[in-house]
Amino acid sequence: VIAAGAALPFIGRPTRAATTPGRLVFGLSSYPPSLAPWANTGTAAATARLMFHRGLLGYAEDGSVRGELAERWERADDGAWVFHLREAFFHNGKKVTAEDVAWCIEQIAAEKSTAYLRAQLQDIAKVEIPDAKTIRLHTKDPSVTLPLNLASFYAPIIAKDSFKESPHGIGAGPFMLTAEERGVALDFTAFDKFYRPGLPRLKTLRLIAYADENLRVAALQAGDVDLIEYVPWQSMTSIEADANLTMQSTPGPFMYLTFNGRVKPFDDPRVRRAVAHAVKREDVIKAAFFGRGTPIGGLPIAAGTPYYDARFADSLGYDPAKAKALLAEAGVGTGFSCKLLSTAQYGMHKDTAAVVQQHLAAVGMGVELVLPDWPTRVTLGNRGQFELAVMGSSADSNDPDGLTPFIASNVTASYVRSTGISTPDIDRLLAAGRTEFEPAKRRVIYDELQQKCNEQAPIVALCFRAQAYAMAKRVQGFKNLPGALTFYSGTTIEQTST
């Protein structure tokens, strides 16, 4: 199948379909498992939500934090974060008010909430509403990272009590959701009261799911879609060579392994470290990403960024002899069997799993692959129904605190992280980094964090990967955001034209 997909550019593709001015058809990698506003159900769902939901803050195309529903914000003398709302409207015609914002924060942080950012927003101790366009957030401790959490696409602002009108809530994004063809496509029309004058540039938008990555590429080449996400790595070279297409690629997302600490022997950090030392990252990059990646032997902190430290960068790198020694020390030196959860829907996940299976076998671990479709993989992960799992994602921001969802143990259960592993030292250091405003002191904290993570191995990072969008040459304005923010690129559809 891969060979056929790779050959498509050279075998007389169909004539490109005619384009309707003001309309964009976007090929997603999956139909969103859920459009619940505050849940993490994958990149396709996040992209779809960015069409009709927006938060207080978001990201500009250069990766900087920008205002969305808040036109400006500052930290007050008493330590509170103050947000000043712009004139904005929800899709039901009601004005966005501070009361809506307060209600959303309460819903996300509620004790029984399943929101992805519940733990982070529980740091907000008090919410004040001086007037309809101002909201003051007092945190339990000083927080340098609260604006980053509020820029997340997991923290959109919806109209108060609007679940009565829509299961997804009523948002204030650039497009209104007008039709859902379950498992197939989502249709949107431009919202004429969007808060940015002159935007969106498109009149209509269709997000259509192509779970088969080769069919997704073929649809772009044939002109059936104008833009695709998750360009498969085996197709990147041919797309770059196609005069009708443009590809935008950035490093940032990473592949990693998660563990179920309730299942022996993965409760033992020595076994988790052994798994790390057993896997040759270069083989993952070659098999899954056609060489378009960079090995990670510690935490996924990119070289050249302020908090990267070479001393910790390869502490968990490939060393099969050390892996065997650690397994023996943990009392499982004679080997054991386990199941590795991945998915057949994304080639990168499946291929990564195959390489991991091969390398773990070399140190005595018999691994059976479990390869359901993506929605099932998400459900199993959220329920903690796995032993060992392959995952690919991106940090929530380019700040080290953006790794909190992957390595903290005091956050809401999610398919993106390990389960049943308690790491209080890591949780303490993450909290300390959040409350420190001095960069030099934050660096000391994150150095210690890297050391503790290399000892406890709450996850095992494998490699950074190139992440690309591809589009017809006529598509203008779309931007692939840098580094960890690549999955926020859907934000720029508001400025995209055809």
Could you tell me what each predicted segment is?
Residues 27-77, 106, 168-171:
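N-terminal lobe/hinge region of extracytoplasmic solute-binding protein
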Residues 64, 148-206, 212-214, 321, ...:
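Gly/Pro-rich hinge or "lid" segments in bacterial periplasmic/extracellular proteins
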Residues 74, 117-159:
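Surface-exposed binding/hinge segments that line
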Residues 98-106, 132-138, 173-174, 201-204, ...:
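Alpha-helical secondary-structure segments
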Residues 193-238, 358, 366-368:
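Ligand-site clamp/hinge motif
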Residues 295-329, 346-349:
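Structural transition elements
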Residues 362, 368-377, 404-473, 497-498:
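Extracytoplasmic/peripheral linker and loop segments enriched in polar/acidic and small residues
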Residues 469-498:
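Long beta-strand-rich cores associated with HINT superfamily self-processing modules
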